[in-house]
Regions:
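Active-site core segments that coordinate phosphate-bearing ligands/cofactors
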Residues: 2, 8-10, 107, 114-171, ...
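Short linear loop/turn motifs
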Residues: 206-215, 321-328
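Residue-level signal for inorganic ion chemistry
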Residues: 26, 49, 75, 103, ...
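N-terminal glycine/serine-rich phosphate-binding loop of ATP-dependent small-molecule kinases
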Residues: 1-96, 122, 148, 225-233, ...
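Short beta-strand-loop/turn "lid" adjacent to the catalytic site in phosphate-handling enzymes
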Residues: 62-101, 127-131, 138, 162-185, ...
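A generic structural motif
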Residues: 35-37, 101, 285
Length: 335
């Protein structure tokens, strides 16, 4: 390939990792994809092996880099949101599996905290639900054999990937991901001491919140990945989709069908009051001093149901079989 600037995107989804190189001259992109395992240890529980996620990132990224003979200007990362893990900053080893956004193990705990809903809603734009990261972090600290030491790191998947890409030099997240934790004040744009105290999460264990656009770190050299590539973009997957669909004007919106289904609407740079049935979230922070917000409606399970049919109850061997299977009956029998 001729020498033309390249940007590589890492899409760290719920079921797999895709790395893709995009060329400034419009040449065909180069990509690699790798699935990782879904673990269902108990009803309502969903976990990922954080090391397997990192291995998939490393494998797909190095595969793409090997096919690129042009300068790599930057790496951008978009990721499944709310999924959280704990790891040791000294060794880099995870404390058990990551708890996935779909996991419902903290439902009872969220019910116990119902009286705190006004505080959570006002600070975060979210509702008290096990979907979000705060109660998952609390569970890890109480039940996950996670030592609360100075070396503790608690983060979402973007933080884990960047930590590994930089070999521990950068422990960061962006505001779009932070806004999904139930611990981040989306008006003050910082971690909330009140909410961290509510969930028993030590603020020193949380990543530094940086702009969605801007240098968050640089890669360290590892097999197939050269040193010094800037990591210049971070966004939660649905916010990245809103940006990628060019929803830059107030009122513009997108709907994404994937593991779940998510409708987001750009509502401008003033944080709106909570709306019944909707979530308020940070869309992006481009480092300009203004934050763009979004309203969100979510259905948690759509595409992931197909993977469950394949891997959970084994009634299909391939996702492509679901269409003919659905067409083989006249209706769902009232289900």
């Amino acid at each position: 390939m001729s020498q033309t600037a390249v940007v590589i995107a890492i899409d760290a989804g719920t079921t797999g990792i895709r790395s893709r190189a995009v060329f400034a001259d419009g040449s065909p992109s180069v990509s690699a994809y790798q699935e990782f395992t879904q673990y269902f240890p108990k009803p309502g529980w969903v976990e990922h092996d954080a090391n397997e996620i990192w291995q998939a990132v490393h494998s797909t990224l190095s595969t793409v880099i090997a096919q690129v003979n042009s300068p790599i200007a930057a790496i951008g990362i978009t990721n499944q949101r709310e999924t959280v893990l704990a790891w040791d900053k000294l060794t880099g080893k995870p404390h058990g599996n990551a708890i996935v956004w779909q996991d419902r193990r903290t439902a009872d705990r969220c019910g116990e905290l119902a009286s705190e809903l006004p505080l959570v809603r006002a600070k975060t734009g979210l509702v008290l639900d096990p979907y979000f990261s705060g109660s998952k972090m609390e569970w890890l600290l109480k039940h996950g054999n996670v030592p609360d030491t100075a070396q503790l790191a608690l983060g979402t998947i973007d933080s884990w990937i960047i930590w590994n890409l930089t070999q521990g030099a950068a422990f960061v997240t962006d505001a779009s991901n932070a806004s999904r934790t139930m611990l981040f004040d989306i008006t003050a744009m910082k971690w909330s001491p009140e909410l961290c105290s509510l969930f028993g999460v030590p603020m020193r264990a949380l990543p530094t919140v940086v702009a969605s656009s801007g240098r968050a770190g640089v890669t360290a050299a590892s097999a197939g990945i050269p040193a010094g590539i800037p990591i210049s973009g971070i966004a939660g997957d649905q916010q990245a989709a809103l940006f990628g669909q060019a929803c830059f004007e107030t009122g513009s919106s997108k709907n994404t069908y994937g593991t779940g289904s998510f409708v987001l609407m750009n509502v401008g740079t003033t944080c709106p009051q909570p709306t019944e049935g909707m979530l308020t979230t940070v869309a992006w922070d481009l480092g300009t001093g203004e934050t763009t917000y979004a309203l969100e409606g979510a259905i948690f399970v759509t595409g992931s149901a197909i993977q469950w049919l394949r891997d959970g109850i084994n009634i299909i061997d391939h996702a492509s079989q679901i269409g003919p299977l659905a067409e083989s009956v006249p209706n769902s029998g009232g289900v």
